[in-house]
């Protein structure tokens, strides 16, 4: 440590202006290298005594100690300042980050609120536009109905005049009674304006379809001369009667049915329903009574061993017949024993959107029931999209006979079979659709029809015929409805 003090003193003296410093190095007696630094005093011409030198050295040591203490104090203050600065900087950064996070959170909330407002605005605009379109459509429909009403009134007035003219000119009175004339028959017989014959005559004179003015019986079905039994051609479809409305989005479309040939333990009131929105359709709701069905309280829920596809299922003779999902296989599921009794592929049948009805929904294979039994409606590549109709054996699902029609399956909304005749519906969404084609399996011929058919809820995804009740069952946009029909002998 004293050597360092001497070196410091030498440097200090040299730094104060000494310009005659000498530096020398040489080996001492032991061979070690020694460095010698010589500086001339600027004020003293001769060296002081030894005691004076020691006093000067001590003064220098005291000054050095004081300077060292000042240096250490300065270093401590610098370290304190650096620590304080670091803390201040860290606090400022932390505060800035917290402020930034808070601002970003508020900004995100504002953005979400803005997006919600924009979405609500778009929804309101879309709803408003839909209302405007519906309003325009209703106004147009109202105008058409008013025009039709006026035309009908004019035609009825014209027909009344024609009937009056016929009354006057048909049977002129005679002065002398004929021998074949019964007493009281001299006057012209009066028309009974309430009879079915007069209504049919008036409809012919006014070119109004008879189905629009025929009187109905209390059950809502027009009177037909063949009664409630026997087969005939479809000539009239009534207005839909709504029995039930589905509660959830899964009921947008589906299938509901009653067994036209019920077996124990089921009755004519037993009803089944399947909601077919989704990809894994296995639940079948069973209702023992019609009132349970209308109120929505199933007595049992079947879980099918394999998923079904679309709205083509039917119930016949105690079994549920349906198309297996993503396949051309028809499955017979016995409801009482809850077991699969038969499975059969329909040769070449399109499936899973290959040849559906016009509304889509994977309606490639559609099962149907009429007075003669079980049918399947489909199409094939060989038929080039035309409807193919096959009669099925209900026990083993073997194809008994097949007919290829000239009706394109994708051009019609749905189809059903009555008395061996295939009927198609023109539209699933138009409120005023028609039964537009008929194919007779007895003659192998088809013809066009214009029987009015009402899609009240404008999305009919299923239409089936029940030969026991002589009604059409349909599923129209969440709603399960029935239609009365009229058949005439062929």
Curated annotation (Swiss-Prot):
Modified how: Palmitoylated. Undergoes a calcium-dependent proteolytic cleavage at Gln-212 by CAPN2 in the endoplasmic reticulum. The result is the production of two fragments, one of 35 kDa containing the C-terminal olfactomedin-like domain, and another of 20 kDa containing the N-terminal leucine zipper-like domain.
Location within or outside the cell: Secreted; Golgi apparatus; Cytoplasmic vesicle; Secreted, Extracellular space
Keyword Nuclease: no
Alphabetical keyword list: Calcium, Cell projection, Cilium, Coiled coil, Cytoplasmic vesicle, Disulfide bond, Endoplasmic reticulum, Extracellular matrix, Glycoprotein, Golgi apparatus, Lipoprotein, Membrane, Metal-binding, Mitochondrion, Mitochondrion inner membrane, Mitochondrion outer membrane, Palmitate, Secreted, Signal
InterPro entries named among the record's database cross-references: Olfac-like_dom (IPR003112), Olfactomedin-like_domain (IPR050605)
Binding positions (Ca(2+)): 366, 414-415, 463-464
Biased composition (Basic and acidic residues): 153-165
One Gene Ontology cellular component annotation held by this UniProt entry: mitochondrial outer membrane
Phenotype of null mutants: Mice lacking Myoc are viable, fertile and show no significant differences in intraocular pressure or clinical signs of glaucoma. They also show a reduction in cortical bone thickness as well as trabecular volume.
GO biological process, one term: myelination in peripheral nervous system
Disulfide bond annotation, renumbered to this chain: 231-419
Residue numbers spanned by region Disordered: 153-184
Signal peptide: 1-18
Positions glycosylated per UniProt: 43
Entry keyword Disulfide bond: yes
GO molecular function: fibronectin binding; frizzled binding; metal ion binding; myosin light chain binding; receptor tyrosine kinase binding
Chain segments annotated as coiled-coil in the UniProt record: 69-170
Quaternary data: Homodimer (via N-terminus). Interacts with OLFM3, FN1, NRCAM, GLDN and NFASC. Interacts (via N-terminus) with MYL2. Interacts with SFRP1, FRZB, FZD7, FZD10, FZD1 and WIF1; regulates Wnt signaling. Interacts with SNTA1; regulates muscle hypertrophy. Interacts with ERBB2 and ERBB3; activates ERBB2-ERBB3 signaling pathway. Interacts with SNCG; affects its secretion and its aggregation.
Its job: Secreted glycoprotein regulating the activation of different signaling pathways in adjacent cells to control different processes including cell adhesion, cell-matrix adhesion, cytoskeleton organization and cell migration. Promotes substrate adhesion, spreading and formation of focal contacts. Negatively regulates cell-matrix adhesion and stress fiber assembly through Rho protein signal transduction. Modulates the organization of actin cytoskeleton by stimulating the formation of stress fibers through interactions with components of Wnt signaling pathways.
Protein name: Myocilin
Organism (species): Mus musculus
């Amino acid at each position: 440590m004293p050597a360092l003090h001497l070196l410091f003193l030498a440097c200090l003296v040299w730094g104060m202006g000494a310009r005659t410093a000498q530096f020398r190095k040489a080996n001492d007696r032991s061979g070690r290298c020694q460095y010698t630094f010589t500086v001339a005093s600027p004020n003293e011409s001769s060296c002081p005594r030894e005691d004076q030198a020691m006093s000067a050295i001590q003064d220098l040591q005291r000054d050095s100690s004081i300077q060292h203490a000042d240096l250490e104090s300065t270093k401590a203050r610098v370290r304190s300042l650096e620590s304080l600065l670091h803390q201040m900087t860290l606090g400022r950064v932390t505060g800035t980050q917290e402020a930034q996070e808070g601002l970003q959170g508020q900004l995100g909330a504002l953005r979400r609120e803005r997006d919600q407002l924009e979405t609500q605005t778009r929804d309101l605009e879309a709803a408003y536009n839909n209302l405007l379109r519906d309003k325009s459509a209703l106004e147009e429909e109202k105008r058409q109905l008013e025009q039709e009403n006026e035309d009908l009134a004019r035609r009825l007035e014209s027909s009344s005049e024609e009937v009056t003219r016929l009354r006057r000119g048909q049977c002129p009175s005679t002065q002398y009674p004929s021998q074949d004339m019964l007493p009281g028959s001299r006057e012209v017989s009066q028309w009974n304006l309430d009879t079915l014959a007069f209504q049919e005559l008036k409809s012919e004179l006014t070119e109004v379809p008879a189905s629009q003015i025929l009187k109905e019986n209390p059950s809502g079905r027009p009177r037909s001369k063949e009664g409630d039994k026997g087969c005939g051609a479809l000539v009239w479809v009534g207005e839909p009667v709504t029995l039930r409305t589905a509660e959830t989005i899964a009921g947008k479309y589906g299938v509901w049915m009653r067994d036209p040939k019920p077996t124990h333990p089921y009755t004519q009131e037993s009803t089944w329903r399947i909601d077919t929105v989704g990809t894994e359709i296995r639940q079948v709701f069973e209702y023992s009574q019609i009132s349970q069905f209308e109120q929505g309280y199933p007595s049992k829920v079947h879980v099918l061993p394999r998923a079904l596809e679309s709205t083509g299922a039917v119930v016949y003779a105690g079994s549920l017949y349906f198309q297996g999902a993503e396949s051309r296989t028809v499955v017979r599921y016995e409801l009482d024993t809850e077991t699969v009794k038969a499975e059969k592929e329909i040769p070449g049948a399109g499936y899973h959107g290959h040849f559906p009805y016009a509304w889509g929904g994977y309606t490639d294979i559609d099962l149907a029931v009429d007075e003669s039994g079980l049918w399947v409606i489909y199409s094939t590549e060989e038929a080039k999209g035309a409807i193919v109709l096959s009669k099925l054996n209900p026990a083993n699902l073997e194809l008994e006979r097949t007919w290829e029609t000239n009706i394109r399956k994708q051009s019609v909304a749905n189809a059903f079979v009555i008395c061996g005749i295939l009927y198609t519906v023109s539209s699933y969404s138009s409120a005023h659709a028609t039964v537009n084609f008929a194919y007779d399996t007895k003659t192998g011929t088809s013809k066009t029809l214009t029987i009015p058919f009402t899609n009240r809820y404008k999305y009919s995804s299923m239409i089936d015929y029940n030969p026991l009740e002589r009604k059409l069952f349909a599923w129209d946009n969440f709603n399960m409805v029935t239609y009365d029909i009229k058949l005439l002998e062929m």
